[in-house]
């Protein structure tokens, strides 16, 4: 999975630099951002890597667990991407994010992830970053995981990934998580950093 993550990160940067067939589209309103940076490009690039490597996967996969994220009736939520083992059980759950979403987006996704009993990837695309950006995002990750860790099923690997397009950097942190056991991420310095 690490090579696939690396390839997706490289291709995202190439999309941003218009050196790939997939590009980030332009905004046509008076947005201060010129390009729309979203998780959709990551979803396509991961899908391409899975197809190229003959890895079974699905998109927008219903969760087995029920969640009440809107309305009054608990329902299945959706994972952005899931890869499968040969026996058709989940291998990796992948949740995609971009920019700096509200805290509730973190807790909503971590709620799904802790209940899935499999390995998980949090893949986050940023146009740019500084220490303050990472401090804010890491705080949201810590809060989101801490709120849900008591419900964690099993003992699994989680990968927290940041791709910073303009700086051409990939940040990776591998965590082993289980119920009631989570050591807070202290800073971006804990992550492996790779120049792309």
Give the label of every model feature segment.
Residues 57, 118-121, 160:
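Hydrophobic anchor at the start of a short beta-strand
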Residues 39-41, 60-64, 95:
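Acidic-residue sensor for enzyme active/binding pockets
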Residues 127-196:
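Domain-level recognition of nuclease-like catalytic cores that cleave nucleotide substrates
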Residues 1-52:
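Interdomain/boundary linker segments immediately adjacent to catalytic/signaling cores
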């Amino acid at each position: 999975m690490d090579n696939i993550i690396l390839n997706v990160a490289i291709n995202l940067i190439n999309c941003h630099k218009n050196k790939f067939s997939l590009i980030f589209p332009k905004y046509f309103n008076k947005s201060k951002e010129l390009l729309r940076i979203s998780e959709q490009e990551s979803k396509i690039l991961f899908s391409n890597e899975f197809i190229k490597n003959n890895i079974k996967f699905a998109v927008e996969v219903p969760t087995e667990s029920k969640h009440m994220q809107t309305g009054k009736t608990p329902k299945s939520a959706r994972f952005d991407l899931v890869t499968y083992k040969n026996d058709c059980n989940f291998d990796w759950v992948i949740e995609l994010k971009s920019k700096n979403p509200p805290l509730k987006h973190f807790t909503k996704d971590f709620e799904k992830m802790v209940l899935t009993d499999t390995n998980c990837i949090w893949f986050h695309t940023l146009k740019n970053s500084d220490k303050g950006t990472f401090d804010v995002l890491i705080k949201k990750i810590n809060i989101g995981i801490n709120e849900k860790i008591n419900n964690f099923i099993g003992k699994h690997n989680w990968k927290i990934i940041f791709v910073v397009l303009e700086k051409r950097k990939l940040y990776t942190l591998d965590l082993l998580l289980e119920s009631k056991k989570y050591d807070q991420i202290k800073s971006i310095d804990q992550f492996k950093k790779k120049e792309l």
